[in-house]
Amino acid sequence: WIMGHMVNGISQIDQFVNLGANSIETDVSFDKQANPEKTHHGVPCDCGRNCRYQTKFPDFLKALRKATTPGDSNYHEKLILVVFDLKTGKLSENQAYDAGTKMARNLLQHYWNNGDNGGRAYIVLSIPYLKHYGLITGFKEALKNEGHEELLEKVGYDFSGNDYLSDVKEAYRKAGVTGHVWQSDGITNCWLRGFKRVKQAVANRDSADGFINKVYYWTVDKRVTTRKSLNAGVDGIMTNYPDVINSVLNESAYKTKFRVATYDDNPWETFKN
């Protein structure tokens, strides 16, 4: 999965997919009532990027639905996964549950079209704080209460805070999550980060009793880091330059071992090294 980083303006959806992304990451900010308000990262952000793109959340979801609905004039067959990077830093632990229910209702109405031929992409809810695991509970319960529990088949989860994996496992236990787990590891492209923890995550994925299904590394903009990520055995690479990742995947060392995922590849299924 080649994951276009910080796609917060509607025009950026086309831009990143046309560069070769089959997945995008979108930042979601919340208001004081725990409503998902807009797609916006803000300052500071990755080096070399404009941090200020923003779109009202329902409007972004509608555009995303068009981009992922077969037959729509804006449809991109390649765009199969969307990671919502949920900026929950200003929310209390109690509000995390509310944020989850409101995320679910927004997605149900504006993205899934109330279950009637909505967008087809898989969704990952990426949460920065383990203490906000209630967001997952709220999300799941809201979809059940709305009569659309089947849409949870399209939803996965990620805790993005680079926490100890044992603590991540415990947060999922509290949230009642078994499966559909993506594990991120990384840092802004302005800094260098080693591969120790990402290798631990891959080892968990590949073990008989691991809780992780997929591992992705962020933010990778250089060819040398791309190669190191692939050598570590990751499933996804988040990048500001999807074309760079694509070109490395076409190198002789990698093109027989890796390919770009399509809609037929189940993002919740563990593919072991």
From Swiss-Prot:
Q: Where is the active site?
A: 5, 41
Disulfide pairs here are 45-51, 47-190
Can you quote the record's cofactor note? Binds 1 Mg(2+) ion per subunit.
The cross-references to InterPro entries, in alphabetical order and at most eight, read:
PLC-like_Pdiesterase_TIM-brl
Localization (cell): Secreted
Which CDD domains did the record assign?
GDPD_like_SMaseD_PLD
UniProt main location, coarse = secreted
Q: Which cofactor does it need?
A: Mg(2+)
Reactions accelerated catalytically: an N-(acyl)-sphingosylphosphocholine = an N-(acyl)-sphingosyl-1,3-cyclic phosphate + choline; an N-(acyl)-sphingosylphosphoethanolamine = an N-(acyl)-sphingosyl-1,3-cyclic phosphate + ethanolamine; a 1-acyl-sn-glycero-3-phosphocholine = a 1-acyl-sn-glycero-2,3-cyclic phosphate + choline; a 1-acyl-sn-glycero-3-phosphoethanolamine = a 1-acyl-sn-glycero-2,3-cyclic phosphate + ethanolamine
Where along the chain is Mg(2+) bound? 25, 27, 85
Q: In which tissues is it expressed?
A: Expressed by the venom gland.
GO BP annotation list: killing of cells of another organism; lipid catabolic process
Per the UniProt entry, the Enzyme Commission number(s) are 4.6.1.-
Q: Which major enzyme category is it?
A: lyase
List, in alphabetical order, the Gene Ontology terms for molecular function in this entry: lyase activity; metal ion binding; phosphoric diester hydrolase activity; toxin activity
* Keywords (A to Z) from UniProt: Cytolysis, Dermonecrotic toxin, Disulfide bond, Hemolysis, Lipid degradation, Lipid metabolism, Lyase, Magnesium, Metal-binding, Secreted, Toxin
Q: Which GO terms describe its cellular component?
A: extracellular region
- What superkingdom heads the lineage? Eukaryota
Q: Which family does it belong to?
A: Belongs to the arthropod phospholipase D family. Class II subfamily.
Q: What does this protein do?
A: Dermonecrotic toxins cleave the phosphodiester linkage between the phosphate and headgroup of certain phospholipids (sphingolipid and lysolipid substrates), forming an alcohol (often choline) and a cyclic phosphate. This toxin acts on sphingomyelin (SM). It may also act on ceramide phosphoethanolamine (CPE), lysophosphatidylcholine (LPC) and lysophosphatidylethanolamine (LPE), but not on lysophosphatidylserine (LPS), and lysophosphatidylglycerol (LPG). It acts by transphosphatidylation, releasing exclusively cyclic phosphate products as second products.
Q: What is the protein name stated in its UniProt record?
A: Dermonecrotic toxin LruSicTox-alphaIC2
Q: Which organism is it from?
A: Loxosceles rufescens (Mediterranean recluse spider)
